[in-house]
Amino acid sequence: ALINVVANIDENYFPVYWKDYSKVNSLRVITVEALVRSSDWTDGRDNALSTIFGVEGEFLVRIGDGDRPRDQYQCVAPGGNFPGANVVDGLPVDEFVHIATVYNADTGERSYYKNGEKVYSDNSATRAIDLSSSCYIGYSWEPGRWLPGEISEVRVWNVARTAEEIASNPYMVDPHSEGLIAYWKFNEGTGSKIIDHTGNGNDLTGNTTPTWINVELPELKK
C-alpha cells in the first residue's frame, strides 16, 4: 500500500508556522490538495463547518457553510466564496476523497477537483493571497470548526497543478516536485509532530496528539 496510516484530527488543529514567510505572503497561484475521510460530515455540525486548510477570510478550504449542507465543499478566496450553495454534490462518507483547489490570479481561474475530476471552475480570481499568518489545518474562526475525521497527503503548491497531475497523484507525490511549498503526509503513526517532506522546514505540531488510524490505500480490490 502507498498509505498505511493516517491521522484522525477530530477536535484538533495544527497551526502552520511557515519557515520562510516570503514564500507564502503573495501567492498569485496556489494549489492545495488533501485526502480526507469522515464517517459523518453533518452530525453535530449544526452551526459549524469543517476546516481543511487556510486562513480565515483570506483563503480557506473547508466543507460546509451556513448557506449549504455541511457536506458541500467551499473555498473562501478573493473573488468570493466558491462554488455557490448546492452547485456541487456533497462529499461521500466512510471513504477517502481527494480534494484539490487551484487558484490562479494570473489567468483568473479558480477550480475545485474531487477525486481528480474538475467539478467546478470559474474566472473570478483577482489578486495574490497571503497565507503568512493565522494559517491552520483543522481550525478557522473558532474551535468548533474542526475536521470530523481523517486527513492525509496535504500539499501546498505555488503552481497550478493540471487536471492530469491532480488525478494521477492522490496518494503520493515526489517531495521535491517543482513548486511544492509544503507536503504533510500525516503518516507518522505516533506523537503530534507532522513532518514537511519537502525539506522546506514547515513542520507542524498538533494542538493535541491525533488518533493514528491504520489504513490501506489505495484500497486493494477484493
Map each language-model feature to its residues.
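Extracellular glycan-interaction surfaces
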Residues: A1-E11, E33-T42, E56-T126, W141-E142, ...
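Extracytoplasmic low-complexity segments
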Residues: A1-N12, A167-K222
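Residue-level detector of conserved, well-ordered beta-strand and adjacent loop positions
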Residues: D10, K19, G54, A100, ...
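Extracellular/lumenal carbohydrate-interaction signature centered on repeated Trp-anchored short motifs
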Residues: D20-V32, V88-V97, R127-I129, P143-E150, ...
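Residues that flank catalytic or metal-binding motifs in active/ligand-binding sites
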Residues: R28-I30, L49, G57, E95, ...
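Extracellular, beta-strand-rich glycan-interacting domains
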Residues: I30-D40, V97, R145-Y171, I181-T190
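Aromatic-rich beta-strand patches that line glycan-recognition/binding surfaces
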Residues: E33, D43-F59, I137-G138, A167-Y171, ...
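Extracellular glycan-interaction patches encoded by glycine-rich segments
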Residues: G79-F82, S121-D122, L131-E153, R161-V173
